[in-house]
Structures are given as C-alpha cells and as structure tokens.
C-alpha cells in the first residue's frame, strides 16, 4: 500500500496544511518512516505522534515539520497542539473505520505539518490541524482526487497564493480583442475599459509588436494581470527562435504565418509545445488552409481564418471550418476580419471557437459596452459562476 493525502484548512496564521503518506511497515513508506526517525535534520526533527506522553497513536505516525523550527516557542507548538491534533485525528480515523482497525499494526503514517512562524492560538492550531489531518487521511484512503476530478478542476481552480487563474483554452467560444494600434498609452487606456471575462483574450497585433517589441506583453500583464495574451508575430522564418522569444516574454500564445515554409511552421509549433504556450497558424492569404495543415507533421493548437483589413469586403472562408476540425486532435478555429456584433452568431454556427475583433472594439467610443455586446453573443457564463466553493 502506498497512499497519498493532502488537505488545507483554516486561516492564517494558524492555517493547517497537511501532506501525508500511508503505507505498509514493510513497504516504501515503512522505509521512509524508519529513515525519517533516525536521520535527523536541524529545525525539521521528526517526532512520533502521541495521544499523550507514553501513548503512541496507532497506526504509528511520524510528524515532520515543514517550516524550520527556530526556537522553543515554535517547538512547543509542534510538540503540543499540532502533535495532539495529528494523533487524535489518526485515532479517530481508526475508530470511525476510515483506517481498518485490523490493519493498525501493519501500517505507518508520515505526516508533514505546516506551522506558520506567526501562529499563536493553540486552540485554532489544534482544530485546524485535527481537521486537516483527518481529511487528508480520508482522502488518501479513498484515493481522492481521482484523475477525472483533477482533469475537471485543473482549469477551474485558482491557487490562493497565485491569486488568479492562468487561462487555458478549454471552454470555447472566446472573444479575442486584437490591438492593431501602436500608441501604448492608448492600448493601456482601452485595456482599462475592457470588462473582466473568463472568455476574453488579448492580442498584441503585429504593428504594436513591431513598434514596442515582444516585451509589450509584460506591459499588458501589468495593466491587466491574469490576461491571456496572444503575440501576433506572423512568423515567416526562424520559427523556433521567434516562438521562444514570445514564451520568454510570457505570452500565452504566438501567431505563425501559414505562408511560412512548412519546416518553419513545424519548428514553431514544436517549440510552442516545448515551452507550454499555444501555437496559432494564421491563414491570411493562404489559398488552401486545409492543404497546408495536411502537409504538416504536427498540427497547431489554433488555426486562424483571417481576412485582411484591406480585404474586408471579400467573402469569409468559414466553410472550411468543419474540414479543419476533422483533421484530428483538439484543434480550435479562430475567425478574424470583418467581425461585427450582427454576424458573430453566424461565425459560431459555422464552427468558430474564437471570434477575433479589432477596431470594432478598440476604436469604439464606448469600449466596455461594445465588448459586452460581443461577449453576450457568445452566450457563455463565467467559470463556476454559480458554484459555491469551500474546497470542492
């Protein structure tokens, strides 16, 4: 048996964060238990969990402090309320049948305990660590979370230390606002007027990038933290190098021209996968986007069917969307050029996942209102808007 459990309960500074292992005495957890008890580390000395002095918890439990213990006051917290909480939680887990009583002598538990250096309230320390330990044991014994739960939650969750959700493109459709203006002050003004939305992407257009360089991404992040930022480089050569520049600048996605040599496109897509950002192939002026995609050994994350600003009176190429999606994978299709509020639904019905809008928003007299009009056409609620969260 090798089981892993984790739980966080309470508020700072007494907050409890428990990581634990449960396993057989004769298995890897048992070996780690023996090593931990005999190989001591200054400030992180492990101790056996006891109900009271001379009364070990069963299964035998080793407590390991996560935070360096620097003085006797901090040591007293570990040896007092934290140790008592862990021991009681283990004993109660056995009594309640969470840990089978008949296996209490066969198993060992290693519990890693976090105690904030500013924690003072013994009662809160005890209650938080008791609850967190008991919950972590239950989760370990039940195999929580399973893989399906992790996959469901991974894009919905916000880590409290991080403070915001890092967007991924898992819940289309999205509105992508493209900035083809070059005045950085004007860009920041428009950004400040755009409403918050889980379905909104920010694109730094090619003219803006040429004027200010790839570091314009960081300017956007300072003005609008947590944004999904697309860097439109329209890469035609040195695909891997330009994608790496975009990734190093903290872009979430980079645009490669579909007119580039096949090798350049493939190198760019592979570099994007390597660095963890999205690859977008822009089919601006490409006669047969499907043919280009079929010639590639690796597909991009997004294909953009792009009608140029200078060609906005010509016909859209949305009819190729189903064929593009049939090529496999989770490929998304973005449409750009001549998108207005009154034709967004047409694009979505054609299969578009991302609606790219530029001047209709960025040069609007009322940026917020115009953005909200486009967002309303997506008919998507905010992620977990109606879920009341504790932990799950």
UniProtKB/Swiss-Prot annotation:
One Gene Ontology biological process? carbohydrate biosynthetic process
Residues holding substrate: 19, 48, 66, 68, 83
- Active-site positions on this chain: 17 (proton donor)
InterPro entries, alphabetized: Aldolase_TIM, Fae/Hps, HCHO-activating_enzyme, HCHO-activating_enzyme_sf, HPS/KGPDC, OMPdeCOase_dom, Ribosomal_Su5_D2-typ_SF, RibuloseP-bd_barrel
* Biochemical pathway: Carbohydrate biosynthesis; D-ribose 5-phosphate biosynthesis
In residue numbers, the region (3-hexulose-6-phosphate synthase) covers: 162-392
Q: Name one GO molecular function term.
A: orotidine-5'-phosphate decarboxylase activity
Q: Which UniProt keywords apply?
A: Carbohydrate metabolism, Lyase, Multifunctional enzyme
CDD domains found in the cross-reference section: KGPDC_HPS
* The reaction(s) this protein catalyses: 5,6,7,8-tetrahydromethanopterin + formaldehyde = 5,10-methylenetetrahydromethanopterin + H2O; D-ribulose 5-phosphate + formaldehyde = D-arabino-hex-3-ulose 6-phosphate
Q: Where is this region: Formaldehyde-activating enzyme?
A: 1-161
One Pfam family from the UniProt entry? Fae
Q: What class of enzyme is it?
A: lyase
Q: What is its EC number?
A: 4.2.1.147, 4.1.2.43
Which family, according to UniProt?
Answer: In the N-terminal section; belongs to the formaldehyde-activating enzyme family.
Read off the NCBIfam families from this record. one_C_fae, PRK13307.1
Q: What does this protein do?
A: Catalyzes the condensation of formaldehyde with tetrahydromethanopterin (H(4)MPT) to 5,10-methylenetetrahydromethanopterin.
Protein name stated in the entry: Bifunctional enzyme Fae/Hps
Q: Which organism is it from?
A: Methanothrix thermoacetophila (strain DSM 6194 / JCM 14653 / NBRC 101360 / PT)
Write the lineage as a comma-separated list: Archaea, Methanobacteriati, Methanobacteriota, Stenosarchaea group, Methanomicrobia
């Amino acid at each position: 048996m090798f089981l892993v459990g984790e739980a966080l309960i309470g508020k700072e500074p007494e907050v409890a964060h428990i990581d634990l292992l449960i396993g057989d005495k004769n298995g890897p957890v048992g070996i780690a238990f023996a090593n931990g008890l005999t190989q001591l580390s200054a400030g992180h000395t492990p101790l056996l969990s006891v109900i009271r002095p001379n009364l070990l918890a069963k299964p035998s439990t080793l407590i390991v402090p996560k935070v360096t213990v620097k003085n006797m006051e901090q040591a007293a917290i570990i040896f007092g309320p934290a140790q008592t909480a862990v021991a009681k939680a283990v004993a109660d887990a056995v009594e309640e049948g969470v840990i089978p009583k008949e296996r209490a002598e066969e198993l060992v538990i290693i519990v890693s305990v976090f105690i904030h250096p500013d924690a003072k309230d013994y009662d809160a320390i005890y209650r938080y660590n008791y609850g967190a330990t008991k919950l972590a044991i239950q989760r370990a014994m039940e195999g929580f979370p399973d893989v399906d739960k992790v996959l469901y939650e991974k894009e919905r969750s916000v880590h409290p230390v991080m403070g915001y959700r890092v967007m991924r493109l898992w819940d289309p459709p999205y509105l992508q606002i493209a900035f083809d203006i070059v005045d950085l002050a004007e860009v920041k003004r428009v950004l400040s007027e755009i409403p918050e939305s889980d379905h909104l992407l920010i694109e730094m257009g090619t003219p803006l990038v040429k004027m200010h360089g790839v570091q314009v991404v960081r300017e956007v992040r300072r003005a609008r933290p947590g944004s999904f930022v697309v860097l439109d480089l329209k890469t035609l050569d040195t695909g891997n190098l330009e994608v790496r520049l975009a990734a190093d600048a903290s872009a979430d996605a980079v645009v490669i021209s579909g007119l580039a040599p096949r090798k350049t496109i493939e190198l760019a897509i592979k570099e994007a996968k390597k660095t963890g950002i999205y690859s977008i192939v822009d089919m601006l002026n490409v006669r047969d986007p499907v043919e280009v995609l079929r010639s590639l050994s690796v597909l991009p994350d997004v294909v953009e069917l792009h009608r140029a600003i200078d060609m906005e009176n010509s016909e859209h190429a949305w009819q190729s969307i189903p064929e593009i999606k049939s090529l496999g994978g989770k490929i998304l299709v973005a449409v750009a050029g001549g998108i207005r509020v009154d034709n967004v639904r047409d694009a979505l019905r054609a299969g578009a996942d991302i609606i790219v809008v530029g001047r209709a928003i960025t040069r609007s007299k009322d940026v917020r209102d115009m953005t909200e009009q486009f967002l309303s056409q997506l008919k998507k609620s905010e992620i977990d808007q109606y879920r009341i969260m504790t932990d799950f």
